[in-house]
A protein has these predicted regions:
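Conserved AMP-binding/adenylation subdomain of ANL enzymes
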Residues: 189-226, 231-263
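Conserved AMP-binding A3 loop
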Residues: 30-32, 164-204
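Conserved AMP-binding/adenylate-forming core of the ANL superfamily
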Residues: 18-63, 70-71, 88-93
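A short N-terminal helical cap/helix-turn-helix that marks the beginning
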Residues: 1-21, 36
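Flexible, low-complexity linker/hinge segments
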Residues: 1-3, 135-163
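Conserved pre-ATP/AMP-binding loop-to-beta segment of ANL
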Residues: 151-168, 174-175, 214-223
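A short helix-loop-beta submotif of the ANL/AMP-binding
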Residues: 61-81, 85-89, 97-103, 222-223, ...
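Structural core segment of the AMP-binding/adenylate-forming
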Residues: 47-48, 75-146
Length: 263
């Protein structure tokens, strides 16, 4: 039994490779593309010695790239760290330092903010810019799409269900705090929600893939609008993670605010 996010998604991508997994505006990625792009990012992370329990900050808006970067981090048994894009400099420094983040994926619109805090984050091995045409003039800064285009895919491997999944809370009780879960136990809790509508709770990632294949054969794979920010627990857990267990599509909006996205 291997209940691990990366292993589950890899198996789903093998069973329904040509089905869409991510849609953000006009950018559609199939499950095969989702897996392959994440594997190339994972190769880069592995080259930077990101491995079991290494932390990777996701300072991003809702986007395909957010979920690809998260998948890549899981592939190397790292821990994705959700970063609130509304944080100002001091909050960002605290969060990234407190979490021991070693890599940060950041939206290009926050380049200047990253530049201001970079020298106060000595643990960071790489800053990865998502979007924009000009790469931020900063040491150890890389363009997201160039990483994917220049690197091979990291080979798959067996992973531990004891790998950590972490969610940083907001600052309603002071500074942000990281809540840690073992992936196997956390996934089983999510699956009880995902399969509350008549499906048996699966015992392994292979059981999940069988359900996904059945839904695909019956043309019953659906789309889920991720309305909440992925950097919030609600947006990630109910907007993406639960639905991925059924091979569903995560429908994302890059623009902040639903009004801008729909009209």
């Amino acid at each position: 039994m291997e209940m691990h996010f990366a292993s589950v998604w890899e198996t789903i991508s093998d069973h329904i490779p040509d089905e869409p997994a991510l849609i953000c505006d006009d950018d559609i990625k199939t499950w095969k593309e989702y897996d392959e792009r994440a594997a190339k990012l994972a190769f880069f992370l592995d080259e930077k010695s990101i491995s079991n329990d290494s932390k990777v900050g996701l300072y991003l808006h809702n986007s395909n790239e957010y979920l690809e970067a998260q998948f890549a981090t899981f592939k190397v048994e790292g821990v994705p760290i959700n970063v609130n894009y509304r944080y100002v400099e001091e909050e960002l420094i605290y969060l990234l330092d407190n979490s021991d983040s070693e890599v940060v994926f950041f939206q290009s619109s926050y380049s200047e903010r990253i530049k201001k805090i970079a020298d106060k984050l000595p643990k960071i091995k790489a800053f990865i810019q998502v979007g924009g045409t000009d790469l931020l003039d900063l040491k150890n800064c890389y363009m997201y799409e160039e990483i994917i285009s220049k690197n091979p895919s990291l080979k798959r491997k067996t992973r531990s269900e004891d790998n950590i999944y972490m969610l940083y809370t907001g600052g309603t009780t002071g500074m942000p705090k990281g809540v840690m879960y073992k992936q196997g136990a956390f996934m089983n809790s999510l699956l009880k929600t995902a399969f509350a509508m008549g499906f048996d709770v699966p015992e392994s990632h292979l059981d999940i893939s069988e359900t996904v294949s059945e839904l695909s054969a019956k043309n019953m794979l659906s789309k889920t609008i991720v309305a909440c920010p992925l950097m919030h627990g609600t947006g990630m857990w109910l907007g993406a993670l639960v639905h991925f267990f059924q091979g569903e599509v995560a429908l994302l909006f890059l623009n902040l605010g639903l009004t801008q996205s729909f009209y």
